[in-house]
């Protein structure tokens, strides 16, 4: 067994180590060999002293090494955590406080920012390690956390992406401890929400909204004596949370009403009803946002409306999606009304006021603003469905109707404007993802699928490549000549402008191709539609062509087929809808190298052969036993069975039987065929004696009837049509030569197959 490197050796190397050597020391500190109480007071104590010395150094590099060493040794060595974790946390906090002071006075360089990140991460890890450990939490964490929280709040003004995740965790897990700092933190978050919110990246925006929502977990309201009329009312634990959520919902109504200055709401009674159902602003409430001002002469001021709605929608999404320590009530009906109202703000169904229609620039801005407002409603719907699932399906008709308002159409037409759809590609991907979640849980309950068919057309169009220079080639020759005539210096070469020759020579290079992420989202939507709805032939053909062509293209270019395309091909094969032609051969040819189990089973079905063999053997043995025991009884039972079950005239019945002696065959075209002893046939009618399971064919007429009997002569009824047919009985004599195989004693009881006796009542009737 290999012995670990002594801790004292690692401690001596720690201060002077650089690069790979330092990483190697951290690797060895993870070893469980050092979790030994004997080493705690000797070598491990020396190591901790070395780490403390690094943290107290003025060198940024030494502080950085000390942070990583403290995190590793406390994470993998519980003895060090219990004995020295509190001291290490105290030293790290002191260095963090100094760095925060430096950051507030002036900006840090790249190395200083890296050290600041290491200090913040070290404090976060050490606090998580001490949490839920009674002794450490009581003696070190709780006393120290009251000093750590204000320092982190101060730093959150400058480094929100770094600090807000830690503060969010502290609010959630130490709500009571965080209460004194609630007001200070709310001021900073309000500043982020009202000023410069759009300058933050999407992840940081979500952190700001989550922290603002978590502030409502802290009970800041003082106890008020209730009167006799309200003293019996039940108080809910989420009362403060509900107040914060309703305050955000109430901010939407004034913004929707402000859009009434642009659109003529009197033309849409449904929207007027929706606005009436929205949460109103409370009389005593104060908004954290300033009032908006719009100037129709400055169209850019209209963008303040979607900007404010974007902030409110993200705040509301945090209120309904973040986990809480207690149960909260979500007003789904109010959320549905708000989302429907946002998606109803469109100039396609509600006309713009007459005095604003002449300004082309203003109208273009209005349409763009309304699209952004609608997208806020789509994101709210997506969060609702993702969080609450089937509970939201009671609003399914409202959701689909509201989403259908987002589809752009050409002017004065019901045709989809695919160019605008491509410009709204990011927004439509959210729509496809939302509809996929709904359809997967609704199944075949939808009756009106016109909206889904429109989405299929849009999705297929988004998968096509777009040429960036398409408009260049659409200019007419007349326009070119007109432009040339206005040019003064026709023959003078413009050296300041580059050549446009590549546009004509290499036009295929100026294209926008669909990325794999878009394909994945669309394929999931197509799979949910195909699996849960029966589409018409036109849509199924388009989807099959798209899946086969794109999958084959990826296979040729990348050497493999993406997973979502394999799932789409599988769904098209298993769920063909009303189609009778399968794409299985083409799908198997495309993904034959992927070793897909489903296609392998469909291409090579495996039957339970052992079970089939045992059934065949059992049937044969039972037939011989019955024949040996009581052949006459067996024949009578068979005859009665077939008499009770007439054979249809239009079918061919083949019956195996065994001939021990020459038999007579009476062919009755009306009802039955009887076999009698003592009648033989000539050799020209029957060739030779044949083994069992073969057939003899006797031609009686052009219409053939095949029958098979087993073991004994029996009477077999032949089905007769509803018409009454009168015809005399004809006899056919059959001679069976049993002497041709005298040397084979074991074949005396062999089965013979008699050719089908062809009976034709139609021919006799014609005569």
UniProtKB/Swiss-Prot annotation:
Residues 699-767 are annotated as: Disordered. Residues 742-752 have a biased composition (Acidic residues). InterPro entries: RIX1_N (IPR012583). GO terms for molecular function: chromatin binding. Keywords: Nucleus, Ribosome biogenesis, rRNA processing. It holds the Pfam family RIX1. It comes from the Eukaryota. One of its GO terms (biological process) is regulation of DNA-templated DNA replication initiation. One of its GO terms (cellular component) is rixosome complex. Coiled coil: none annotated. Belongs to the RIX1/PELP1 family. Component of the RIX1 complex, composed of IPI1, RIX1/IPI2 and IPI3 in a 1:2:2 stoichiometry. The complex interacts (via RIX1) with MDN1 (via its hexameric AAA ATPase ring) and the pre-60S ribosome particles. PANTHER family: PROLINE-, GLUTAMIC ACID- AND LEUCINE-RICH PROTEIN 1 (PTHR34105:SF1). Component of the RIX1 complex required for processing of ITS2 sequences from 35S pre-rRNA and the nucleoplasmic transit of the pre-60S ribosomal subunits. Regulates pre-60S association of the critical remodeling factor MDN1. This is Pre-rRNA-processing protein RIX1. It comes from Candida glabrata (strain ATCC 2001 / BCRC 20586 / JCM 3761 / NBRC 0622 / NRRL Y-65 / CBS 138) (Yeast).
